[in-house]
């Protein structure tokens, strides 16, 4: 039985699975894989080699998570924030710190390439969650949004809440993206609105919905890199 299925409080479950693997002994446990179906995702510690990421495996600060073509995974962090990765996507989990007592924390995630959905959890000071792509810095305000990172730049499509985008390290004007809007920051730092129909889709980010109770999408605390597949 996994710690997840025991229904333990987040802080208790995390404390019990801190043993982890030796490769991650010097890094902080920040969450785990919450997608039941394995679709090729891998995780690699900073400076280390990649290994498969199965359901209920831990993820750690500094870890690079990647998916192959037609791959997908979903990560759940300490405050129940969800990060969905679609096909051929890579992200670096710089850090994610959360205090469940005060419901405050600090996080940084770097999106290298691919298609993602990000759904905020219980963390209250959401402005401390720093998300970056090669062309954009993003500040979230209670949000559910899709993010596409490719050679053409970055696309942000907001479903709920708001996302403030700062193109190219602040060299261009900051823009607030609202629900029902999609904005692209091009590789040359130009900012433009785009039609929702022009936003790429992917089964890993568009099938079902976050926390919708569909198979493999149950809400739960972060699991651990342990058990039969660990």
Roles of regions detected by a PLM:
Residues 23-227:
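Flexible, surface-exposed loop/linker segments and immediately adjacent secondary-structure boundaries
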Residues 3, 225-230:
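Eukaryotic intrinsically disordered, low-complexity regions
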């Amino acid at each position: 039985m996994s710690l997840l299925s025991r229904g333990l409080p987040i802080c208790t479950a995390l404390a019990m699975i801190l043993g982890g693997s030796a490769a991650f002994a010097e890094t902080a446990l920040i969450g785990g894989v919450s997608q039941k179906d394995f679709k090729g995702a891998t995780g690699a510690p900073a400076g280390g080699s990649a290994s498969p990421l199965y359901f209920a495996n831990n993820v750690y600060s500094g870890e690079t998570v990647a998916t192959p073509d037609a791959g997908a995974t979903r990560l759940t962090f300490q405050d129940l924030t969800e990060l969905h990765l679609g096909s051929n996507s890579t992200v670096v989990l710089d850090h994610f710190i959360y205090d469940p007592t005060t419901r405050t924390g600090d996080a940084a995630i770097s999106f290298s390439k691919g298609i993602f959905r990000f759904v905020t959890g219980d963390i209250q000071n959401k402005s401390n969650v720093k998300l970056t792509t090669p062309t954009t810095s993003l500040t979230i305000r209670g949000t559910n949004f899709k993010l596409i990172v490719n050679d053409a730049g970055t696309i942000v499509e907001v479903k709920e809440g708001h996302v403030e985008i700062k193109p190219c390290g602040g060299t261009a004007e900051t823009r607030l993206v609202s629900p029902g809007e999609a904005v692209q920051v091009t590789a040359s730092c130009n900012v433009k609105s785009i039609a929702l129909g022009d936003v790429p889709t992917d089964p890993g980010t568009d099938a079902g919905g976050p926390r919708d109770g569909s198979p493999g999408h149950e809400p739960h605390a972060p699991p651990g890199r342990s058990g039969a597949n660990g």
